[in-house]
Design a protein with these regions (language model features):
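Conserved AMP-binding A3 loop
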Residues: 30-32, 162, 169-193
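Conserved pre-ATP/AMP-binding loop-to-beta segment of ANL
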Residues: 2, 17-18, 128, 144, ...
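AMP-binding/adenylate-forming catalytic domain of the ANL superfamily
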Residues: 130, 488-510
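Gly/Ser/Thr-rich phosphate-binding loop
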Residues: 230, 255-260, 269-329, 341, ...
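Conserved AMP-binding/adenylate-forming core of the ANL superfamily
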Residues: 2-5, 10, 18-63, 67-71, ...
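Structural core segment of the AMP-binding/adenylate-forming
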Residues: 47-48, 75-149, 470-472
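AMP-binding/adenylate-forming catalytic core of the ANL superfamily
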Residues: 87, 104-106, 250, 258, ...
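Conserved AMP-binding/adenylation subdomain of ANL enzymes
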Residues: 192-209, 216-257, 271
Length: 529
């Protein structure tokens, strides 16, 4: 197996160049053709003078050029920065400036929107524009090239910059649930180890066809490509608008593997799936899948094995629950993935007892290189792990997740809450997920989020925003009455809001708790005035 992420494609091309590697709409690339496309990008970037470890940002919807640009940048010895296509110009400008991007790959339409913010990106030198060359937009002070011109054969091949597995491969920006987004620096080693670990427990083979639904800027979304290319499988790209688009793609492309986040699974579970569906497995990450959704998925897709996973961008993937354990412990996030150790620690660094809440700490090959250009945040989350072996002088870095979990007597882990989402009300600390589990269990809602908002006497009050299940009629009074018997008094929501539309999402498809908190932050303060 390769030590470098781009070699996944080249090795699969050497093994079976005619095997289908990438599908996007009507475009179908075998591994030989994809390897050639990546090599052309590599040579194009080197011809532009890209130096070792310089950043190449890719701001595109999922398509062939997006994939070729990312892996081509890595192959050249650079670092790719996938930018979520849903981000607005100001957010994109922040990322380009923050990680000192040298080359930007985008479309003509997106470039037009970005022009006002590019002046604040002093390290940017070149923009490569996909699509028709006649749509090029000139930008003062920047070299603007058409894709075909940038990747054209320029004669004598240039040798890529030499990199090793501990060098940077990518910078992935978090969704910004707490303040400005942070750039998580992933090495080749991180990404290769992550792909190998996930592919091993999903048992991926060249016969798999994996649907890439999630943004490639999301570590979980990017993982669909890396596991596919490592395994010699086929990755099918989709820029979906509705859950029904996913069903159509699964059927048309005979998809065997599907990854999604909880809000999307809620919609997918409500679809009428054919009995002969080819799905072999489903994976969930980005938040806990509620029991009613899991049960509905298992009824709709009885032959597909659900893998419940937990991961943080800072360590790619951390845990998974084997499908065989679902009936015994459907609320568990499982145990550590292969080649990782996951611990539950007290603030003093000692191991928690079974049932005792503590912070999830991850060590091993998947732990990233920290946050780009942010030594304070890096020092806060990435700390030396002191080995129990007294003779070992040097320490390794582990990542402290900020997530509170517990383990049972058999070592299976259970998520409690994120430290920055904990609701502090009437002197109690309440996990939003505890309240949400009760709300979902009433089987009246399709989506729900519990948040803490400022309150003049309670410190924070619990507010639940709920969106009804399809075809259901729901009132705040009915939902409150249904939940009250199942909650201690301090956990009973002070307010329930019935949303008129699906709850807002952040760029990674998760329910946007930060936005909801902002929308309702003055609810009780205004009422008190």
């Amino acid at each position: 197996m390769s030590d470098l992420i781009h070699d996944f494609i080249f090795q699969s091309a050497r093994r079976n160049p005619a095997a289908e590697a990438l599908v996007y709409g009507q475009r179908r690339l075998d591994y030989g053709t994809l390897a050639e496309a990546v090599s052309r990008v590599t040579q194009g970037l080197l011809a532009l003078g890209l130096q070792r470890a310089e950043r190449v940002a890719v701001y595109l919807e999922k398509n062939v050029e997006n994939v070729a640009a990312m892996f081509g940048a890595a192959s050249a010895g650079g670092v790719f920065v996938p930018v979520n296509p849903l981000l607005k110009p100001e957010q994109v400008g922040y990322i380009l400036a923050d990680c000192n991007v040298r080359v930007l790959v985008t479309s003509a339409d997106r470039l037009r929107l970005l022009v006002p913010v590019l002046a604040s990106c002093p390290d940017l030198r070149t923009v490569i524009v996909t699509g028709s060359a006649d749509k090029l937009v000139p930008v003062d002070g920047l070299q603007v090239l058409a894709w075909d011109a940038a990747v054209a054969d320029n004669g004598q091949p240039r040798a890529p910059h030499r990199v090793i597995d501990t060098d940077m491969a990518a910078i992935l920006y978090t969704s910004g649930s707490t303040g400005k987004p942070k750039g998580v620096v992933l090495s080749h080693r991180n990404m290769v180890a992550g792909a190998a670990s996930v592919a091993s427990y999903l048992e991926n083979t060249p016969s798999d066809r994996i649907l890439a639904v999630l943004p490639l800027s999301f570590d979980y979304g990017l993982s669909q490509l890396t596991t596919a290319f490592l395994s010699g499988a086929t990755a099918v790209l989709i820029n979906h608008l509705f859950a029904g688009d996913i069903l159509k793609a699964v059927v048309a492309e005979k998809i065997t593997g599907l990854a999604a986040v909880p809000p999307l699974w809620i919609q997918v579970a409500q679809l009428a799936w054919p009995e002969d569906c080819t799905l072999r497995y489903l994976t969930n990450s980005g938040g806990a899948m509620q029991r009613p959704t899991l049960d509905a998925l298992r009824r709709a897709l009885p032959r597909a094995k659900p893998f419940l996973m937990y991961g943080l961008t800072e360590a790619f993937r951390s845990t998974y629950l084997p499908p065989a354990e679902l009936d015994r412990r459907p609320d568990s996030m499982g145990k550590a993935i292969p080649n990782a150790e996951v611990m539950v620690l007290r603030p003093d660094g000692s191991e928690c007892d079974p049932g005792e809440p503590g912070e999830l700490v991850h060590r091993g090959a998947l732990v990233s290189l920290g946050y780009w250009n942010d030594p304070a945040k890096t020092a806060e989350r990435f700390k030396p792990f002191v080995s129990a072996q007294r003779g070992l002088t040097l320490t390794e870095m582990a990542v402290w997740s900020g997530d509170t979990v517990r383990k049972d007597e058999e070592g299976f882990l259970y998520f409690i809450t994120r430290a920055d989402e904990m609701i502090k009300t009437s002197g109690y600390r309440v996990s939003p997920s505890e309240v949400e589990e009760v709300v979902y269990a009433r089987e009246m809602v399709g989506e729900a989020a519990a948040i803490g908002v400022n309150h003049p006497t309670l410190g924070q009050a619990i507010v639940v925003i709920a969106y009804p299940r399809e075809g259901a009629t729901l009132t705040d009074a009915a939902l409150l009455a249904a939940c009250k018997p199942h909650l201690p008094a301090y956990m009973v929501p002070q307010k329930i809001v019935i949303a008129a539309a699906s709850l807002p999402r952040n760029p990674n498809g998760k329910i946007d708790r930060k936005l909801l908190s902002q929308q309702y932050e003055n609810t009780f303060m205004e009422a008190d005035q």
